[in-house]
């Protein structure tokens, strides 16, 4: 346990505390709030804070509007092609947002496909991808599945008898949804909205790709990379990002604590089978929503096969040379990506399983603190953790490298591991809860030590969850 504490403290807790300390201290090391006063005195930072808050809320609102119809249809109806619909609805999570931004520029940008058509037909253009609107559009199309997936689970867990009783008393249609269904599904909807908000304000690649820098995440990145690591304003911006994340977490928890959402008993979920014209209408609605959400994928697919695509509705020429370039002439891009992600995933599985085992199978003091530190990256924006790594490890030589840790590929693996650790901890915890302790006790009674019991009994049974 001490080893796990040391790892999590070194690579999660200490970098974040280091960022906080620099923002709250002066040149002599004394605590001060002068840096935050200077932050609010500067119009650039005030506008960046306001834009970040507004963009995060707008992404949540538009993601909710896109997700609710899809979630309700998926959770409440059975029809041909439902599995295909569910799969297509989660595809936006496959590509990073900044990749989607590149593709959307070719479809909705100033000289993109849609604006070329508008110019041809109506002699006008619409600035879909300009400024904050473009950032909100890209992030909405990428992050809405977080709300969708959580809302589907919440809708499926609602006791059908609650709605049946309301219908027997004359409550139907939208009134039924507003008075009964919506309040009961709020926990899942709020959880998805919270995750969407945090991911939206944390997103660095999309604003930079769209050349919109007046948000907190780009400002933190630019201050540290252009002015330097000694620029206090960059650390203050990072603390402002952390503050927004924590406030959103507390607000969601407070809101959900105002009411009771549990039911005493729950019947099996009831779905209605659609046939005939109703299936066509459902696919018409879902097809329109998913068609918009999959625009980045369509654009990136066309771009990958194009040789030239500029100021035309579609690529003028197509080629497989782009794939040949990546696969045969520059394969190190793919090799490095696979190597780093596989190493990070392997480390996450080891650390996540070990932490979950300590949480469930031990009574050691401090295990709850260990869980809190391991879960911290969910609330800490990635750019804040990256800035903390630069500050802490820039002058620290990694054993065997002979160079600072931040100048080697090792720091990427560590960052990926720590950033995604909460997911493997929670997955391991859930899987381990399904393994009865009597199975481990039986192995130990036959002479196996705890390590052998974990490797031979526990680990194979939780592999599916991992």
Name the predicted role of every residue range.
Residues 25, 106, 204-228, 312-316:
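Glycine-rich helix-loop "coupling/hinge" segments at transmembrane-helix boundaries
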Residues 163, 440-441:
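Short alpha-helical segment that forms part of, or immediately flanks, the ligand-binding pocket
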Residues 1-27, 37, 41-156, 182-204, ...:
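Membrane-water interface segments at the C-terminal ends of transmembrane alpha-helices
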Residues 435-439:
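A donor-sugar binding/catalytic signature common to diverse glycosyltransferases
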Residues 162, 216, 247-265, 297:
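Juxtamembrane interface elements at the cytosolic ends of transmembrane helices
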Residues 63, 169-171, 446-448:
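A short glycine-centered flexible hinge/capping loop motif at secondary-structure junctions
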Residues 255-288:
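Flexible interhelical linker loops that connect adjacent transmembrane helices
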Residues 167, 222, 444:
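Alpha-helical residues within the helix-turn-helix
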